[in-house]
């Protein structure tokens, strides 16, 4: 018996016919979370956000997200408005492209 006989056969070029299911995080109303689209990057971890409630807010990327997640113009994010200044918000989640497609199909994103 050789070493080649002991190796498991690999299937490199076989496409999977199974659909992959991913859980998509939706905004939680009890935590005052809102969906928003990034309009522009302002620098110094700040951005201009167009929220789904119709308000344009200045967003802040907290330090816990700064290095891990890169946010660009046009990205869809979840924000939490500040309690004492409604025109400012913290970004807490960024969606990937397949997740944005799912949100559009389910009616979470308007227009």
Swiss-Prot record:
Gene: eIF1A1
Entry-linked SMART domains: eIF1a
Keyword Protein biosynthesis: yes
Originating species: Methanosarcina acetivorans (strain ATCC 35395 / DSM 2834 / JCM 12185 / C2A)
HAMAP family tied to this protein: aIF_1A
Official protein name in the record: Translation initiation factor 1A 1
Keyword annotations from UniProtKB, A to Z: Initiation factor, Protein biosynthesis
Function: Seems to be required for maximal rate of protein biosynthesis. Enhances ribosome dissociation into subunits and stabilizes the binding of the initiator Met-tRNA(I) to 40 S ribosomal subunits.
A GO BP annotation: translational initiation
A GO cellular-component term linked to this record: cytoplasm
